[in-house]
Structure formats: structure tokens, C-alpha cells
Amino acid sequence: MPEINRPLSPHLSVYKWQVANTLSILHRATGVFMTLGSLAFAAWIVSAAIGPESYDRVLALLAGPLGLLVLFGWSFAFFYHLGNGIRHLVWDAGYGFDKHVARMSGWFTFIAAVLATVAFWVGVVA
């Protein structure tokens, strides 16, 4: 059999980067981030069970700038993953496969997640 000088799998340079690529990767990343955040949440709960000193240490860590940034990211991950999960359920029902509709629903999901995150944090701070 003659050797054919071509790639066995497509190269990334062949594909044009699209919103769908980014949203798919973001959906997976937010799922991983929420899982890791759940471990941090469990550590916070365990620290409360250990005693007040441990709880105060964890609370101080979460109330600091880095902790607030992580919590803000965790809440965005929650809202985005929730919205995109609903989007996938709509797809499972057989709707929204038109390219334009899929692109617009992706943007809607992302913008809604940003707005929900900001609204949540405005409610938390107020």
C-alpha cells in the first residue's frame, strides 16, 4: 500500500474559529470549575464542623480579593452552565439547529450568564 503524505486527523488550522467552539469549551471548563468549587464549598462546610477558628480562617480566605474573585467566577460558571444546559435540552427536543438560531442562542446564553452573575453579586453586596 503506498504511503500517503497527509494528516490522519484534521489540523486546527483548517477550521475557522467560531462562537460554537468557544461556547463548547467554556461549557466543559465551567463544569470542571464548578466541580472544583464544590470541593472548596465542602471544605468551608467541614471547617464549620471543625470549629470556629477553622471557620474564621476559611471565611477570611474567601472574603479576601482572591477568594471573592474565585466565588465570582464560580457563580458565573454556575449560571453559564445552567443556561447552556437548558440550551442543550432544547436541542435534545429537536429545536434550534439552524446556524443562525444556534449562534444567537449561544450569545444569549453567554450574555444572560454575565447579567445573572452581576445581578447575583449586586444582590449579595447590597
Language-model-detected regions and their locations in the chain:
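Membrane-embedded alpha-helical bundles that constitute the cytochrome b-like, heme-associated redox core
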Residues: 1-126
